């Protein structure tokens, strides 16, 4: 939804001023900003500006501003394969339970919550340290997932960082650079399993370490011995 309101000011003004209203854009679309201002974005990974062309890069909100004006752009996804888990690092178990109120709690331990999935979702799991959320993951059943749509959603939500071909893994970071994301593939027979794992970014690290992910991945049960290389290579061509 785009909206620019033209307002005529006092008689001493040479020309009418432009009032810039907040807008909503689909991811990967562009919009031309009216006027001659020089614009910048509060987060170029969500919405970038080149001249007067505004590009919706990834899902989220960014403030587009010039010397005299500003407005907020909200970027929305065009695909929806999975729902993100709770990523409020440090949150309590009660907060995560509230976030997951529409799902069935399968198992609760001192430092972990596991939820049953439905449809393509195998399960969702949360890890806690010092009573605060420290990791989250979802497992997806590839029999119910379009891999091209999954790749597209990953690029609409996250910034690709690295590929690990030996481990059938893709690494990402969120546009606010606060969360590291791993997409790992495995196969069990003809079924591809996708694990999407989230951990808070620590220090200056740009990717999650194997130590960060080991416990969460094992919870999903992605130790299947099959070879997902064909599907992995298909996704790699889309993601990188």
Where are these predicted regions, by residue range?
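Sec-dependent N-terminal signal peptides
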Residues: 1-3, 64
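C-terminal motif of bacterial Sec signal peptides marking the signal peptidase cleavage site
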Residues: 4-8
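Short helix/turn-capping signatures at newly exposed starts of structured segments
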Residues: 10-29, 44-45, 57-61, 67-159, ...
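Short Gly/Thr-rich strand-loop-strand
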Residues: 156-177
